Amino acid sequence: MDKTWAEVTCEIPAAMIDLLADFLVELSGNGVSIDNLELDTFSLDTMDEAPVKTVRAYFTPDDELEEKLAALNRFIQEHAPAYGDAAPAPPTVTTLREEDWATGWRQHFAPTRIGRKLVIKPTWEPFSPEPGDLVIELDPGMAFGTGTHPTTRLCLEALEKLGTAGDVLDVGTGSGILAMAAVKLGAQRVVGTDIDPDAVAVARENCAMNGVTAELVTTPLADIPGQFSVVLANILAEDLVRMAADLTAKVAPGGFLILSGILVERESYVIDGFVSTGLTLAETTREGEWSCLLYQAGQ
Ligand SMILES: C[S@@+](CC[C@H](N)C(=O)[O-])C[C@H]1O[C@@H](n2cnc3c(N)ncnc32)[C@H](O)[C@@H]1O
């Protein structure tokens, strides 16, 4: 008999996307898709204006599906009112055949423009770049970092604004998305490190697919030699604070440190954790519940 999937569709307030997506990934063990991340319709401005978003998750129909759907409905009913939806609709379920799932899942991903020049494009999508566009090909679903998460987007925007004429260090490289963007934006030398060897393997494949050269390693941060004009770290707030001295030591005089992965409510915790480093907080950018801090080292 053909294998089938249960496609579960949730209509939720836009500001609740991250919360629900995390819950769904945990519950289903699969990735999720979010509508309206298309190139033409998505921008940070329109995201705030769009009141409702569609999030889809994919479950294998098994004995636990009913239970999981009930847990999902409870989660939505409990949390959506805090985001302004007093009467959230329960999720709907459609059964998909394996072959429809394989193509149906893909249809929810489209090329996404981030900042002015960067475009993240799924490998299967045709795309005609504008002059000056820097296109990164990336398939969702392997390592963290497909450009759809606000913490990644905030880093990419910061990186594009800074320009990357010198050397760049990407701490917690995941899919390698930030490392690849740094190369495309003109960095001379890019080093990406991750504690997860699988992520490094994926990042290497992605770099090869995009024809970019970066040094991708599992070397612990403290053991990476040299200093860099830009250091990026999109990891958890607690890790950023724990690694504050090592991250700072890697920033060249006058260079920049971009910190992401910080919930807005944890922003002051991270800022406090970097006070003793001597770096200057140059800019704070936010998207939804996520915050990104840009620090600069003295000359
Ligand atoms: C949120 S993902 C970021 C991926 C990508 N850089 C992006 O911006 O989308 C965080 C990554 O950091 C890695 N990581 C966590 N702690 C780390 C550490 N102490 N040193 C290096 N990598 C770390 C994780 O394995 C994961 O791949």
UniProtKB/Swiss-Prot annotation:
Its main location: cytoplasm. It catalyses: L-lysyl-[protein] + 3 S-adenosyl-L-methionine = N(6),N(6),N(6)-trimethyl-L-lysyl-[protein] + 3 S-adenosyl-L-homocysteine + 3 H(+). InterPro entries: Ribosomal_L11_MeTrfase_PrmA (IPR050078), Ribosomal_PrmA_MeTrfase (IPR004498), SAM-dependent_MTases_sf (IPR029063). S-adenosyl-L-methionine binds at residues 152, 172, 194, 234. It is found in: Cytoplasm. GO terms for molecular function: protein-lysine N-methyltransferase activity. Pfam families: PrmA (PF06325). Keywords: Cytoplasm, Methyltransferase, S-adenosyl-L-methionine, Transferase. Its EC number is 2.1.1.-. One of its GO terms (cellular component) is cytoplasm. The keyword Zinc-finger does not apply. GO terms for biological process: methylation. Methylates ribosomal protein L11. Belongs to the methyltransferase superfamily. PrmA family. PANTHER family: ELECTRON TRANSFER FLAVOPROTEIN BETA SUBUNIT LYSINE METHYLTRANSFERASE. This is Ribosomal protein L11 methyltransferase.
